[in-house]
């Protein structure tokens, strides 16, 4: 009697494992993504720490620019206020400023972007390659988006901050939706003034605001 095919059993920890892999790939920006992925999962299978290094420990590619808030600000100015941008156009912008293609692909994969990209979501994930933590990521996003040239703390509309914080926390997967909601409600009621603006200092210098 022929054997029946056994159903594929997906371990419950797989989604979290893949999410951690994707975040690590954005931070490391490996030159050879396939080889790095093989080394990453081989280390996991042996119970060892995967080859995840912080940016300060990596050597920049000799012919590639390092991702910086300044370069992201240039890209943001080129997007010119659009909420949606086509992937092909954004990829060309990315290429013009000489940023690594692997990093672009990693952000595309983590965000599950297709032909049309929500620019603020893409920008938030690109900033996470620099920020590592959610608070630092949001600080960088605010610096990129801020149009305040008076030398004060970078500032953006609180509605934009709400959108970014909620999205980044969802992608990160380590912070509950209830915590995000609680922090946003506190800031809206106790921190944000009638102008509806939030500054970087509002969420980095206030001990009652714990985004993570």
UniProtKB/Swiss-Prot annotation:
Tissue specificity: Testis specific in adult. Overexpressed in hematologic tumor cells.
Residue stretches making up the RIIa domain: 12-49
Listed CDD domains: DD_ROP (cd23019)
Keywords (A to Z) from UniProt: Cell projection, Cilium, Flagellum, Phosphoprotein, Ubl conjugation
Modified-residue entries (Phosphoserine), positions: 56
Interaction with RHPN1 as annotated region, ranges: 209-212
InterPro entries xrefs: ROP_DD (IPR047844)
One Gene Ontology CC term in the entry: nucleus
Biological role: Important for male fertility. With ROPN1L, involved in fibrous sheath integrity and sperm motility, plays a role in PKA-dependent signaling processes required for spermatozoa capacitation.
Protein's name according to its UniProt entry: Ropporin-1A
Organism listed in the record: Homo sapiens (Human)
Lineage: Eukaryota, Metazoa, Chordata, Craniata, Vertebrata
């Amino acid at each position: 009697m022929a054997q029946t095919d056994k159903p594929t059993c997906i371990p419950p920890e797989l989604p979290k494992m893949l999410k951690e892999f994707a975040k690590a790939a954005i931070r490391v920006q490996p030159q050879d993504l396939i080889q790095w992925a093989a080394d990453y999962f081989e280390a996991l299978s042996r119970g060892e720490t995967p080859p995840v290094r912080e940016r300060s420990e990596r050597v920049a590619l000799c012919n590639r620019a390092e991702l910086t808030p300044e370069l992201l600000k240039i890209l943001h100015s080129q997007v010119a206020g659009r909420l949606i941008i086509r992937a092909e156009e954004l990829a060309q912008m990315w290429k013009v400023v000489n940023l690594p293609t692997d990093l672009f692909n990693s952000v595309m994969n983590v965000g599950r972007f297709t032909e049309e990209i929500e620019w603020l979501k893409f920008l938030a994930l690109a900033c996470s390659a620099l920020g590592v933590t959610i608070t630092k990521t949001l600080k960088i996003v605010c610096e990129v988006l801020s149009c305040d040239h008076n030398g004060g703390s970078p500032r953006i509309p609180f509605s934009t901050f709400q959108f970014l914080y909620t999205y980044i926390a969802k992608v990160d997967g380590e912070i509950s939706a209830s915590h995000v909601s609680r922090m946003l409600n506190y800031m809206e009621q106790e921190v944000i003034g009638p102008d509806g603006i939030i500054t970087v200092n509002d969420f980095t210098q206030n001990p009652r605001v714990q985004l993570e």
